[in-house]
């Protein structure tokens, strides 16, 4: 049986040292049994592979009519979204015969040279824009970037693709951040893998000594964590 996209992505996260199991305190103050470090994708090989995973997820979503094929540009919010937008656009062109642009925002508006808030493919009225980001915790980045996009042009945001869906309740709702953003903005939010898929995949893997990759303790803590915070 062919391995699923989520399984292959979990292997990639582990090989890249982007996924760690243990005891971590998140910005929210929650104690988590796992941590995803997007900063681990720090060379051309890793970021190219990451872009290919995003492109594969996007291609699947197009086949299932979740998002349209005629995407005009892939938008990544600065700063972490910049390499995601570029590598995804390259992978869609090279591997999926799609010609798409890439766009990202500046943290501060530039008033000389090419100027403005945006870099890359210029945004114009009617364009279909697909957002990419790494891991959503509260949806803050999306809520900050949508007004910037709309101020630039009357674009249509057709979806958001993440690397991982943590599937956690937000602080003020029983909805996950993903579901809350979908409800607020009306576009689909997809992830290459969700945390349950990642733990399911990792539970079947072995380490270099042929022992289970996940200890019984980590698996129990993961189950307890998702029981308490899962949405």
UniProtKB/Swiss-Prot annotation:
Alphabetical GO biological process terms: 'de novo' pyrimidine nucleobase biosynthetic process; 'de novo' UMP biosynthetic process; pyrimidine ribonucleoside biosynthetic process
Keyword Translocase among record annotations: no
Origin superkingdom: Bacteria
Pathway noted in the entry: Pyrimidine metabolism; UMP biosynthesis via de novo pathway; UMP from orotate: step 1/2
EC number: 2.4.2.10
GO molecular function, one term: orotate phosphoribosyltransferase activity
UniProt xrefs under InterPro entries: OPRT (IPR023031), Or_phspho_trans_dom (IPR004467), PRibTrfase_dom (IPR000836), PRTase-like (IPR029057)
Record-level GO cellular component terms: cytoplasm
Residues annotated for 5-phospho-alpha-D-ribose 1-diphosphate binding in this entry: 27, 79-80, 106-107, 110, 112, 133-141
SUPFAM superfamilies in the cross-refs: PRTase-like (SSF53271)
Cited HAMAP family: PyrE
PANTHER family to which the protein is assigned, alphabetical: OROTATE PHOSPHORIBOSYLTRANSFERASE 1-RELATED
Name of the protein in question: Orotate phosphoribosyltransferase
């Amino acid at each position: 049986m062919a391995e699923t996209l989520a399984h292959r992505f979990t292997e990639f996260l582990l090989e890249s040292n982007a996924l760690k199991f243990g005891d971590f305190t998140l910005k929210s103050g929650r104690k988590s049994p796992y941590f995803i470090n997007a900063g681990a994708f720090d060379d051309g090989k890793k970021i190219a592979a990451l872009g290919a995973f995003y492109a594969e997820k996007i291609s699947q979503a197009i086949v299932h009519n979740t998002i349209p094929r005629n995407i005009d540009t892939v938008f990544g919010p600065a700063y972490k979204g910049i390499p995601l937008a570029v590598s995804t656009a390259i992978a869609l062109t090279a591997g999926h015969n799609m010609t798409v642009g890439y766009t990202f925002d500046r943290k501060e508006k530039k008033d000389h040279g090419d100027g403005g808030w945006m870099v890359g493919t210029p945004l114009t009225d009617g364009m279909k824009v697909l957002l990419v980001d790494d891991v959503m915790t509260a949806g803050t980045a999306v809520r900050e970037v949508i007004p910037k996009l709309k101020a630039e042009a009357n674009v249509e945001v057709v979806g958001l693709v993440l690397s991982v869906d943590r599937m956690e309740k937000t602080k003020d709702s029983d909805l996950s951040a993903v579901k809350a953003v979908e409800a607020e903005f009306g576009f689909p939010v997809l992830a290459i893998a969700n945390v349950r898929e990642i733990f399911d995949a990792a539970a079947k893997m072995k380490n270099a000594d042929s022992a289970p990759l996940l200890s019984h303790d980590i698996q129990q803590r993961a189950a307890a964590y998702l029981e308490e915070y899962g949405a």
